[in-house]
């Protein structure tokens, strides 16, 4: 049994819900830096979290919108990186790396994929795939390359790092240590912007900001997904094998996966000129 202190400031979900439009990018980046420090510490002792999401990031002592104490919790399914783990898969679909759906083992890079989703959440104020059913079809589309739509509401370098974190190939994702240095650099640049009275603005847009209601079938609690994953991969495999060369070339040209679903990897939701600034 693991006994943890009570964090009266809540978790990252509560922080985003209550402070998205009030916390500056400088404050958000400082908090993000503390989150990646925590993950890096976990990885340094050769542990893989395996269920990393915004509900497992707890806030302690809090200033206005910068949190001095951030703890990564819920290590109940964590394992040593040297321990084989071909067993049941627990988690939340949007935060799970595609290689896990495909039957490969968890690695530190799987946690990094989850961190990329947390970056998206901090950027948009919404949980990934909040408007989708968390079902077999979503698993298949994630394996086809589907990622949440990107908005340009972020400091320079942020989106590029986020996309690297959720790269389909685990080998191409940065380590937690590398992410720390890059987030720190982005944070330093944003501090300079603030000193020059030119901070990155939080833009008011219908595409960002907390939503009052998620899709009722968007399930943001960890659950046993082994059966659903098995069914999804059986269907994904049969669909992939059924396409011919002409269809494959068409899908590649139009940035689509084997199921014929369009990927979102390169789609940008631009902030419109008539949007107001916070």
Give the role of each language-model region.
Residues 18-33:
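Activation segment of protein kinase catalytic domains, centered on the conserved DFG
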Residues 1-11:
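Conserved short submotifs of the Hanks-type protein kinase catalytic core
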Residues 43-60:
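Catalytic-loop of the protein kinase fold
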Residues 166-178:
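A conserved short helix/loop substructure at the end of the activation segment
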Residues 111:
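Conserved catalytic-loop aspartate of Hanks-type protein kinases
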